[in-house]
Amino acid sequence: MKSLLPLAILAALAVAALCYESHESMESYEVSPFTTRRNANTFISPQQRWHAKAQERVRELNKPAQEINREACDDYKLCERYALIYGYNAAYNRYFRQRRGAK
């Protein structure tokens, strides 16, 4: 019992010494990781936003046929399951090629 009190004091001092919070840890300017909607919109200028949207439209128009077929297959659950086993090309041919009239 006599050795318990000095041991508890020693443990408390060790915790205080190891858990000391220095001033350096408070120097971070990221007090809050979240930002307001107004500040979020200032990162990208309207011209850059317009350019990015235009590029996305161009990419959508110039997609390869295989990617368009895969997206159509992804939207249909049975086709997607079939594609996991036999591949997207075979799945698209099975579920969608007949509907378009091609053989």
Swiss-Prot record:
Phosphoprotein keyword on record: yes
Domain Gla residues, every copy: 51-97
Main location: secreted
Biological process according to GO: branching morphogenesis of an epithelial tube; cartilage development; cell differentiation; lung development; ossification; protein-containing complex assembly; regulation of bone mineralization; response to calcium ion
Name of the featured protein: Matrix Gla protein
Subcellular location field: Secreted
Disulfide feature: 73-79
Mod. after translation: Requires vitamin K-dependent gamma-carboxylation for its function.
Family statement drawn from the similarity comment of this UniProt entry: Belongs to the osteocalcin/matrix Gla protein family.
Coiled-coil regions listed in the entry: none
One GO MF term: calcium-dependent protein binding
Cellular component, GO, one term: extracellular matrix
Superkingdom of the source species: Eukaryota
Native organism: Rattus norvegicus (Rat)
Matching InterPro entries: GLA-like_dom_SF (IPR035972), GLA_domain (IPR000294), MGP (IPR027118), Osteocalcin/MGP (IPR002384)
Modified residue annotations for 4-carboxyglutamate: 21, 56, 60, 67, 71
Lineage: Eukaryota, Metazoa, Chordata, Craniata, Vertebrata
Modification type Phosphoserine: residues: 22, 25, 28
Signal peptide: 1-19
